[in-house]
Amino acid sequence: MLILVLVAGLSLISIHLPLGRDEGVAAYFGWQILQGKVVYKDLYHFNLPGIFWTYALALKLFGLKPEAVNLFDLCFRLFTLIGIYLAAARLFGRRSALWGSAIYGLFSTVVYNSYWQNAQKETFALGASAWCLYFFALGLGKERLRNFWFMLAGICGCGAMLYKPTVALAPGLLGLYLLLGNRLKIKARLLGVTGLAAGFLIPAAALIGYLQSQGALSEMVRQVFIFGTAYGGQYYSGGLKVLGLMLWKISDWTMAQGFLVAGAVLGLWGLVKEKDPNWKPAFWFGLGLFLNILVQNKYFTYHFMVLVLPGSIFAGAFLGRVMPRLFSGSARLMRAAVWITVLFLMGANLKPDFGRYGRELLYDLGKISKDDFLEKYGKWGFGDISVTAQYKVARYLKEQTAPEDKVLVFGLEPGINFMASRSAPGKFTYDLPLTYQFGSEKLKTYQARLKKEFLRELGAAPPVYIVVVEKDTSTIEPRDSYEQMLEFVEFKNFLAQNYYLETKIEHYYLYRRK
């Protein structure tokens, strides 16, 4: 209970965090879903829909504002924490579970409940993954309703996949462990794998049926498997450079989270030494989550969030079970020194991220203005967005337009549409599918079709404003959106013929319809 209160309290301090770019996209999609739009059919995106439906639920429950997302993120983190506690308790006992859930609560909140890290796809995939591991552990240990527990594990595994497809490697390795291991008799193993697979297929079939009923299934296939795979494929180009990046990023994260990694390794070592068979499902599950990072080959901070789950469970087993046995015969002073060292190392890992709470508290208490608070978030020229500039643009658009008016933001920031409460004129709410410069000839042909569809939408329902962003380059967009607009000749001509430059707010050109 204490760790739940601590996690909730720290999270509430951060309740006013602004939306990062990814969160802005998901917030806009969630709002549009509440307006009756269907992902893929009415809203173009190459991700699976779990994150957008989750944001829609958050906005429905708590209102159309960033705080709604942060509050839902808090609730979901508590849900995940409970799942981790139950899974760890089932595998390694209550004492280990208490330590594991405490470690998860602190690291997931202090490190990952911050600007641009919170409410990511990984956040919600973690919750489903934790409960997947718990139900799988129940199936291993309980003969009664065994196949039902495995089926629930499969359902949760598919739920995690709806946020992040590669996370499915974790329940997949659990299935292999169940099939090839010797924990159960062969008949029980086969039935268990069947239950796991059936559970996985139930929500997958429901998703396919829903999208087909909405006329969005074929569009989902095109957006996710044509554009999405081409977009993801860019991260594999570069030969040895890719391998070097992988090793560097993993090493950097390992050093930054040294307490978590060292605790997990020591916990795993102790459990193997004790010949506790339950280390195996937890290890294979954690390996699947690690392979998920390698397969997608992306290494932003939030991509490593999934490793906090197995890391916390094994580190909790070390503190709650392995370490007390190691030092059971030691003098009291020795045990105290060990615990002081553990707490010091944990504090050293968390200290860099604790610094933000002071500023957040000042804003919560009304001691600094909103503009001063937002100024910290985002810096031009670092592949980032300026939150302050976004709010200025959104405020201006809201003042100059009616609620029913349409606004197109030609960039990567439909979060401006969300903040201004102004819908985009069509399904293309950000420019990446139209301007992405890598990929095969097949992708280029597909892109040409998208551009024609984009221009048809603009011609049929021209927005009151078109906002074009400059200097928004990043690792995924090496050229800024303004330059890409100039190279998109048909769009540039449409803009010149039908719009005039009304004003410029920082790096945002605001063109108004003539």
Go through the PLM ranges and name each one.
Residues V7, G100-T109, G157, M161, ...:
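Short helix- or helix-capping micro-motifs
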Residues N47, P165-V167, Q214, W339-K514:
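Extracytoplasmic
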Residues L71-R95, W99, L106, W131:
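Transmembrane-helix motifs of polytopic, lipid-linked glycan transferases
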Residues I82, K249-P277, A282-F283, L287, ...:
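Hydrophobic, aromatic-rich transmembrane alpha-helices
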Residues F124-K142, W149-L152, C156-G157, G311-F314:
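Specific aromatic-rich, kink-prone transmembrane helix
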Residues F148-P165, A170-L178, A198, I202, ...:
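Membrane-interface alpha helices of multi-pass inner-membrane proteins
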Residues L169-A170, F290-N292, Q296-R332:
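Hydrophobic/aromatic-rich transmembrane helices and adjacent perimembrane loops
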Residues A170-L201, L268-K275, I313, L319-G329:
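Perimembrane helix-loop-helix junctions
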